[in-house]
């Protein structure tokens, strides 16, 4: 048994709540929608699996190698130690076996599917576009409010600049404020899979939670449907863009 020492609502506030519902119409444009069945506080799929905090485990690391990073030091590694306000999630250390179960059954399974899907798309179509969809708080601690949308392409290294420009322009056309790579330049998923020279393009989209939900209660707001409808437009433009890219490969 793993004892949790924070209220459930604090764990929910760490989630990318309802993002899969915002994008659920993407399949209508021919996209494949892959969403996590576990919350970020259980396993953070947008981390390297080696980003593990040794202090969390009672009998050693689940895997032989751990990688230190500012995220791990802050308690936000692949298996997070802290919740939304920095409070400790667990009342006591968890076992190595419990950590390994999360990594093998959730993390490894998810990323194996992503890798295989991207490989299949490249074999069939000559290219693949991965849009890594997330939500972000409306402000970071005591800093100024964040923009509506933050696009992360690892400063141009994870996808064709035309893709980032198209998405940025599309959001602006719909009335959203947009930032590139600040404060989020793209996480592990974007860095790991974005290989433009191999025709695999990865772009991270962070959506301000204040646009579509009540951040305190973690419930959809009255504007949820508008944001969802706008995202259908974005996905349709992405589909058209990918079709043009595919055609250019055959010329």
Where are the regions that the model predicts?
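N-terminal catalytic or cofactor-binding beta/alpha core of small enzyme domains
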Residues: 1-130, 135-203, 207-251
């Amino acid at each position: 048994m793993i004892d949790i020492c924070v209220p459930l609502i604090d764990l929910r506030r760490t989630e990318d709540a309802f993002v899969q519902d915002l994008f659920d119409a993407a399949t209508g444009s021919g996209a494949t929608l892959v969403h996590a069945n576990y919350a970020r506080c259980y396993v953070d799929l947008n981390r390297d699996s080696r980003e593990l905090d040794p202090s969390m485990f009672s009998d050693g690391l689940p895997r032989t190698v751990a990688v230190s990073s500012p995220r791990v030091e802050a308690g936000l590694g692949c298996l997070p130690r802290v919740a939304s306000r920095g409070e400790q999630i667990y009342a006591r250390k968890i076992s190595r076996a419990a950590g390994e179960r999360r990594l093998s059954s959730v993390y490894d399974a998810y990323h194996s599917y992503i890798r295989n899907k991207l490989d299949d798309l490249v074999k069939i179509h000559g290219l693949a576009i991965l849009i890594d969809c997330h939500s972000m708080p409306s402000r970071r601690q005591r800093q100024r409010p964040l923009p509506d949308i933050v696009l992360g392409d690892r400063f141009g290294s994870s996808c064709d600049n035309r893709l980032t420009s198209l998405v940025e322009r599309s959001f602006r056309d719909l009335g959203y404020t947009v930032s590139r790579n600040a404060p989020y330049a793209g996480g592990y998923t974007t860095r790991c899979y974005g290989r433009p020279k191999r025709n695999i393009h990865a772009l991270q989209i962070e959506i301000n939670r204040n646009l579509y939900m009540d951040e305190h209660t973690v419930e959809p707001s009255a504007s949820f449907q508008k944001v969802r409808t706008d995202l259908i437009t974005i996905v349709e433009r992405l589909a058209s863009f990918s079709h043009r890219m595919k055609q250019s490969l055959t010329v």
